[in-house]
Amino acid sequence: MRAVSVWYCCPWGLLLLHCLCSFSVGSPSPSISPEKKVGSQGLRFRLAGFPRKPYEGRVEIQRAGEWGTICDDDFTLQAAHVLCRELGFTEATGWTHSAKYGPGTGRIWLDNLSCRGTEGSVTECASRGWGNSDCTHDEDAGVICKDQRLPGFSDSNVIEVEHQLQVEEVRLRPAVEWGRRPLPVTEGLVEVRLPEGWSQVCDKGWSAHNSHVVCGMLGFPGEKRVNMAFYRMLAQKKQHSFGLHSVACVGTEAHLSLCSLEFYRANDTTRCSGGNPAVVSCVLGPLYATFTGQKKQQHSKPQGEARVRLKGGAHQGEGRVEVLKAGTWGTVCDRKWDLQAASVVCRELGFGTAREALSGARMGQGMGAIHLSEVRCSGQEPSLWRCPSKNITAEDCSHSQDAGVRCNLPYTGVETKIRLSGGRSRYEGRVEVQIGIPGHLRWGLICGDDWGTLEAMVACRQLGLGYANHGLQETWYWDSGNVTEVVMSGVRCTGSELSLNQCAHHSSHITCKKTGTRFTAGVICSETASDLLLHSALVQETAYIEDRPLHMLYCAAEENCLASSARSANWPYGHRRLLRFSSQIHNLGRADFRPKAGRHSWVWHECHGHYHSMDIFTHYDILTPNGTKVAEGHKASFCLEDTECQEDVSKRYECANFGEQGITVGCWDLYRHDIDCQWIDITDVKPGNYILQVVINPNFEVAESDFTNNAMKCNCKYDGHRIWVHNCHIGDAFSEEANRRFERYPGQTSNQIV
């Protein structure tokens, strides 16, 4: 029996090579099933296309000696699970459609593929039959597998390439080597990595289009003119090693290897005769101009409010793409979403070209409108809105198809100034930071006082380890290392900083209430995170006033669900005026939302008949238009469970019988308007115009991919007898101008909502 043979694809630096991942299903050990057969013919599987990582790509199947693809009609995550196992991975994390990794060639072997997800082979799934398809290769399906191999499958790094030489990596080398150079490097000689090492590029025929592509690869939105007289003078004094010439880019390429270019032959003795090394100068985006303290370039910042943004990403320059239309933010459908459109987004935001064009809500799902679909960009557009697109209807797309991007970023070196020690894996440990000046650098610890989730978010981002799962104030349970000095305290971050040095902190005068290495800061990072959003329309639809007798509120009083004035009321006579509404809280992230406290510390509440896992999960507030709080919900504790879920998502959590608590990805927890404490006590509120505000996870106790969408606001008018609640929206769903109009709302003059 044949062993498994594997041709594995390259890491990102090589992504734009013409390479394929190929897997032969065999049996190198008893843990792998025998080679799968269809009739008398065996099947082989591989991943193809670019740009991609080794565990993702267009699925190709070899049957009867002929390679072919799979149509995306009726393709699901369950089918992706089966195919990823065929390819030697443990499971799928997503799938793609519309030839995201480029169209294949040859036969389309399978169409309308329908799997349960538990099949041992794709041959056990239903389909139209082998070779029976009405699709084109523009509908080729792809898979994103979990980067974890099945036991027994080889994990080779052999790369199958079409040409011997390819441009794998590009850098800028400053012409002047001495002195302390600030990062990122924005100007210098263009060098490409070839098998024999780094080589320069001949500047004969070099154009601004070439510079534009190089700058985009290196994380910069644009290029600028260079003082070539200076570089020509330097070139005469140095020896150069040229490896590349005749580069001709259109300017829309995401990588230099996609341009027309030629390599010098090994025996060529007249390399770049009469020419000089190519030099490029790039423009910093606004984020990095601020980071380096440089003055912002005019190119870097568009006038007026941005009309595109990224949400839900762990790092700068990645996230779900959202666009502004008619004062409201919405998402982009991933149909025909490609690297060209993604690069337009990245450059518009001040980054370089796109490293990945993400589909299938890889950065979590949005909520609300989907503004664009089938966006087709040439790559030259200054804004995504300049690209042709399709007017979308409700039937066209769902939020499970939200598009995302990962952009090329400038190299800043911030990840070299931080490290973790003592943890069980590279994703956790005690945080150590490097301080000092060159020649006198040392590593030190961070005081754990006030260290929390927001600070951990910045640390995990700086480390390149994704999202923060926990921010730890004590790390005594991890092995202590040689580093014992506390060099940073009082760290306060907003969560958006590029490094801990950008957060407010003490460095010269360390103040730490608890001394010793056991009370230093630590983190646990994660590749995925939850993302909670409140269904704002349901709040608006269900809000009403109830005058509830005091004799029915003893349990609520015990739970501290009433205003403080209730303590002096004439119990059990009288009543409290309550603003009731339903809260439907969705988890649209990529990880389950779990309470911070373990089961051992949950509290039993006799009145409600179940355990509460979080003391503070949501704040309910009534605010004046200027933001002054006049009433609050006092909802003391919560039980988290899956009330309902999206199609094909199963419930995992329930409060009954001391069950596990949480909210599964794709599910929501519903607090109905008629349950105890689902209200705000407005007995003491005077008639007027107010803002109803609901904030989920207000103390950042549990990590999420995005905290900016945790607040919901509504305009409301209370006349002493009735209340009108309208204009409810997630806090960041409106444009800046629409938010200003919301806050200036003058109130109602009649029952008519305007």
Curated annotation (Swiss-Prot):
Organism (species): Mus musculus
Designated gene of the protein: Loxl3
Name the record gives this protein: Lysyl oxidase homolog 3
Phylogenetic classification of the source organism: Eukaryota, Metazoa, Chordata, Craniata, Vertebrata
A molecular function (GO) term: protein-lysine 6-oxidase activity
Record's catalysed reaction(s): L-lysyl-[protein] + O2 + H2O = (S)-2-amino-6-oxohexanoyl-[protein] + H2O2 + NH4(+); N(6)-acetyl-L-lysyl-[protein] + O2 + H2O = acetamide + (S)-2-amino-6-oxohexanoyl-[protein] + H2O2
Family: Belongs to the lysyl oxidase family.
Domain SRCR, chain residue ranges per copy: 45-146, 170-283, 308-408, 418-526
Pfam families named in the record: Lysyl_oxidase, SRCR
PANTHER family assigned: LYSYL OXIDASE HOMOLOG 3, LYSYL OXIDASE-LIKE-RELATED
Disulfide topology: C71-C135, C84-C145, C115-C125, C202-C272, C215-C282, C249-C259, C333-C397, C346-C407, C377-C387, C447-C512, C460-C525, C493-C503, C555-C561, C607-C655, C639-C645, C667-C677, C714-C728
SUPFAM superfamilies named in the record: SRCR-like
